[in-house]
Amino acid sequence: MGKLPLLLLLLSVFLTSTLALRLSNEDRQQELGQCLHRCDIRRYSPDMQRACRHKCHMDFGGRKSDEFVVVDYHYEEPELFSLSPYQMCKFHCRADDSGSFGRMLECEKKCAEEYGNENSRNVDERSPSDSRKRFEECRRKCQKTHPDKQLECIRKCQKAQGERKGDYTFEVCERRCQDTRHGSKLACIDRCVKEGRDNEGRPVSPKCQKKCEGEGYICQRMCMKGSDDDTQDRQVSLKCQKMCEGKGYDCQKRCMRMDQSDDNDQDTQVSKMCQKMCQGKSYECQRKCMKECDDDTQGRQVSLKCQRMCRGEGYDCQKKCMRIDQSDDNEDPQISKMCQKMCQGKGYVCESMCMKGGHDDTQCQKMCQGKGDDCQKMCMGMDQSDKNEDPQVSQMCQQICQGEGRGCLQRCKRAEKVDDANTEMNVDPDVRAYCKHQCMSTRGDQARKICESVCMRQDGKIMLLSTISEVVARLLDD
């Protein structure tokens, strides 16, 4: 009986200690749950949230699994549970309850100084190198002066300082936002999320893929936003790609720019007319037609008139018609009336040939059959006028304008008299060099001179032409 009180005492002590342990474990589990809840409701980045949860398990007990890892901002692989002293120090800085990002950075800097971890690619982002310091100054300036465009501004800072460490992903974007002051941190993070969502599922043009290789999706998005790759420009680009095949991107760019100006300058009626007239032909036909039909009243009237006259005869007929009509005021009225009378019932081509004086003896005899000697003399006189042309007109112009009449010779002569010194004085050096290169294959010094002169006056637009005859055709259009 004497041992019974002792047994009861031991049993009560055992039960009390067991209950105390159970209560203690329940308290720790409750505290662990509260700690994890605090981590979940805070606006931490994914890696900081994992660090916070990991600290909860260390402080209040729990499993140690790969679920709770610390990911360094710059590490390519996550750090598992085993932490070095430097990483442990840094982890405590990040899981600090104060929530101050600036204080966390100061804490991490002290960790780096204390443990001297030189292998970490991490946080001392405020690095010892001058380049890094300049980048940080640039970044801080972005945050102060360009809060709405700070991502784009930071990209420029990175480019200027050669900052090329990894893709500029959402995590990096979010991390940059952590240093934002004056309550705009959440707005900055929202922009990061929006940047990421906007990019999802959107096709990226090959040009932007190549340009942003290794740069991440924000670079691609900015490239796509600033490119000319909308629906209309893609259509133009396909046409220009075909027209500029083998001539490089500069040709395409100029082609697209010229097309854009054509679209803005041309009347809808003229545009439809050119599309109809050039149906089934190359895009160059439509572009030339649009250029011919200037957006002034006279140009439209001439174009519509020539369209009627040249129905079924193609674009070359209309081009010649417009050229002749434009030079009608300079032609001898007597010749014009004679040609109209002589070619009555024979169509526009006959009248055109007559106005240009491109007939030989046999042609004159045929055209003037039954119309008297005056007709034949007038026809022959026009024929001789081309042969007895002004001696001041170069042989090169006579050769180019053979069969084209006096209007062509006069324009060619004017082009020859262009003062190269005055022309080159106002010409961009790149355009001048380009024109010299483009006209290098033109035979003859005078021909090359005219080619360069026309090219420079056209500000290099002559790049789409390849022969001297096309150069002069462009000259005649002036």
From Swiss-Prot:
Localization terms from the record: Secreted
Miscellaneous comment: Eleven additional peptides containing a similar cysteine pattern are predicted from this sequence. However, there is only tentative evidence.
Domain notes: The presence of two CXXXC motifs with connectivity I-IV, II-III structurally identifies this peptide as an alpha-hairpinin.
Keyword Disulfide bond: yes
Organism of derivation: Stellaria media
Keywords annotated in UniProt: Antimicrobial, Disulfide bond, Fungicide, Plant defense, Secreted, Signal
Record GO biological process: defense response to fungus; killing of cells of another organism
Gene Ontology CC annotation, any one: extracellular region
Protein's UniProt name: Antimicrobial peptide X precursor
Expression sites by tissue: Expressed in seeds (at protein level). Expressed in flowers but not in leaves, stem or roots.
Gene name of the record: sm-amp-x
Cystine pairs: C435-C455, C439-C451
Main location: secreted
Function: The mature peptide has antifungal activity against germinated and ungerminated spores of A.alternata (IC(50)=7.4 uM and IC(50)=12.5 uM, respectively), A.niger (IC(50)=2.8 uM and IC(50)=4.0 uM, respectively), B.cinerea (IC(50)=9.3 uM and IC(50)=16.2 uM, respectively), F.oxysporum (IC(50)=8.0 uM and IC(50)=5.4 uM, respectively) and F.solani (IC(50)=8.0 uM and IC(50)=7.2 uM, respectively). Has no activity against B.sorokiniana, P.infestans and P.ultimum. Has no antibacterial activity towards C.michiganensis, E.carotovora, E.coli and P.syringae at concentrations up to 40 uM.
InterPro entries documented for this protein: Vicilin_N (IPR006792)
Source superkingdom: Eukaryota
Secretion signal span: 1-20
